Amino acid sequence: VLLSASFVSYVGSFSKKFRDRLIVNTMVPFLKKNNVPMSEACDPLVLLASPATVAEWGGQGLPADRVSIENAAISVTAERWPLMIDPQLQGIVWVKEKESNNNLQTTRLDNKKLLNTMEKCLEGGMSVMIENVQEALDAVLAPIIARQKIKKGHNFFVKVGDKEVEYQCVTTL
């Protein structure tokens, strides 16, 4: 479990080659040295995604290669919302299909209705995809991206611009 948690937390931005080296040369030796119990064939993906889940993702358009499956497992498991660098648009196709039942809304940073879309999705528990993100994000999105929730009574709120919008925990970004 610790290896899988470390995998989700640290390897998402690395290449397949570097991920493998990090696991084999750093993470596994560290865990063994500290007597953390684990199976001989320790594969973080085994705990992160069952074969049925991987098959479902494949049916939703996710490519069957190991890196795509690892990236998908990281994106659905991580506490933070993923930033996908997707020049071949394979991940976008998968996310759109995967989230189609969650009333996925797509928008862009230059869309004049961006904040309205974000408010609607946060309040309605809908998924939202911001496409073509460049190097800088608008600061008004920082509380949303960081999930800076404010608890009032039994409800959570997130600051969107100058408003506090009720946050439904099922919202995905």
Give the location of each predicted region:
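Conformational switch/transducer regions in large eukaryotic molecular machines and scaffolds
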Residues: V1-L173
